[in-house]
Amino acid sequence: QVTLTESGPALVKPKQPLTLTCTFSGFSLSTSRMRVSWIRRPPGKALEWLARIDDDDKFYWSTSLRTRLSISKNDSKNQVVLIMINVNPVDTATYYCARVVNSVMAGYYYYYMDVWGKGTTVTVSSGSASAPTLFPLVSCENSNPSSTVAVGCLAQDFLPDSITFSWKYNQSQKISSTRGFPSVLRGGKYAATSQVLLPSKDVMQGTDEHVCKWVQHPNGNKQKNVPLPVIAELPPKVSVFVPPRDGFFGNPRKSKLICQATGFSPRQVWSLREGKQVGSGVTTDQVQAEAKESGPTTYKVTSTLTIKESDWLGESMFTCRVDHRGLTFQQNASSMCVPDQDTAIRVFAIPPSFASIFLTKSTKLTCLVTDLTTYDSVTISWTREENGAVKTHTNISESHPNATFSAVGEASICEDDDWSGERFTCTVTHTDLPSPLKQTISRPKGVALHRPDVYLLPPAREQLNLRESATITCLVTGFSPADVFVQWMQRGEPLSPEKYVTSAPMPEPQAPGRYFAHSILTVSEEEWNTGQTYTCVVAHEALPNRVTERTVDKSTGKPTLYNVSLVMSDTAGTCY
């Protein structure tokens, strides 16, 4: 095996000579056609060839440095020595030696360096040698389970510029996911940084409070403990959800108690169990991070206990206990003592959107009922002010985690009916209600109608020059009321809503009572350059025929009219 190892001083004073030794093995310079070269790489610059010596003692130098260089070999020691005189700071570099071999092709000799040493760093400075001073670098951002946590170390005021960083967990397990950055000369001394990227889940779930940074330097090795980011410590909120009265099934009749611990951090939960003597029938899910847009990461966990109806009605007390960070949190539940929870039935009457009316040619009325303890006795009905009852379809949801149900009652009226001038009432009855609950909706009156202005903006030339994508913008302004529908088409065919983004209507700053919105369609630059047409269809109740459109393509570069009557649904919704 061929190896080459460079050695020499790490720090040299200006105007002094520099002597570097290359010790090699695996070949001999007394063998024909064997050669050794010296090369250097100054900081931030390309490699620079310096000198070469051959097996027959012939030597060659760089033209710019030949007056300052000498090269010699010692066959008995397998060494090549390079001497550079009158050094100065520009000679600061990493110096390499490499074996040079040659081959003959088509009558020509080709020389190449096939094996290199690892290099030795030489700093030319009038300053005194000094070991680095270390400073920890800690991330200030909140940790996210799907991201990484960055910590680092700043090494400062060291000379010469020869430093090696390594990271370890608890002084034992080596960390490989590191990044090094080039040294920087500042005030005659050097500074360098090293960074390590750790998975957030390891930081939040592990027991390590710091990582160890080892720094090797010719003037002394040093160690620094870098603390890991502090994770917010939050206690769990423990809730128990009891089964509904009709929630027991089978033989013997059984149901489930659900215990949920939420909002805690860090992740570790030492135990989650119901009662003291429960040995079976318990299923505990894995701890999961809660979905949050901001703030510290918190966690939740759910445990389910299967219980018999006889035990539940026999006044047994069930206790869910959670141990977290040395503290105990618990919640009791029994058929005689139900945990406090808001179980009042609520009713929401949801008016139809203009988009649904425009697309289906019918007006759908929706009545949502929540927090039902049972579903078999619920009834939902819609009535109109003038013509009485409207046929209503009712759908029941599956049981929610808090052991309640929800139901939806839907009714449709024909679009031609006078929705704007009539009141519609949703009526809900249930055995838990002393009297029916009612919610009434009608279209707001007195709203001025203003039809929208539609502008279609082609892709910007600067974006097309990048040859990546093309963004077409549809700007809709000055309309009232705020309910508007926007759809994109390509060559007369509707595009999937996943392919574009439409903003919510927003008030016009200079026109009170009016609104604006925009929709953005992004296609590939290749598609745009084929000349395909793209159409923005805008529907609003103030428009003639309720719809208008603008079309653009590469050849026109400006919007034109386009017949998009097919965008409207061919099948009207069913009216009752």
From Swiss-Prot:
Transmembrane segments: none annotated. PROSITE patterns: IG_LIKE (PS50835), IG_MHC (PS00290). Pfam families: C1-set, V-set. Residues 125-576 are annotated as: Constant (C) domain. GO terms for cellular component: extracellular region; immunoglobulin complex; plasma membrane. The modification Pyrrolidone carboxylic acid is found at residue 1. Glycans are attached at residues 74, 170, 332, 395, 402, 563. Residues 1-124 are annotated as: Variable (V) domain, involved in antigen recognition. Disulfide bonds join 22-97, 153-212, 259-320, 367-426, 474-536. It is found in: Secreted; Cell membrane. Keywords: Adaptive immunity, Cell membrane, Disulfide bond, Glycoprotein, Immunity, Immunoglobulin, Immunoglobulin domain, Membrane, Pyrrolidone carboxylic acid, Repeat, Secreted. Signal peptide: none annotated. One of its GO terms (biological process) is adaptive immune response. Residues 1-97, 132-212, 236-334, 352-442, 452-553 form the Ig-like domain. Immunoglobulins are composed of two identical heavy chains and two identical light chains; disulfide-linked. It is found almost exclusively as a homopentamer in the serum. Membrane-bound IgM molecules are non-covalently associated with heterodimer of CD79A and CD79B. Immunoglobulins, also known as antibodies, are membrane-bound or secreted glycoproteins produced by B lymphocytes. In the recognition phase of humoral immunity, the membrane-bound immunoglobulins serve as receptors which, upon binding of a specific antigen, trigger the clonal expansion and differentiation of B lymphocytes into immunoglobulins-secreting plasma cells. Secreted immunoglobulins mediate the effector phase of humoral immunity, which results in the elimination of bound antigens. This is Immunoglobulin mu heavy chain.
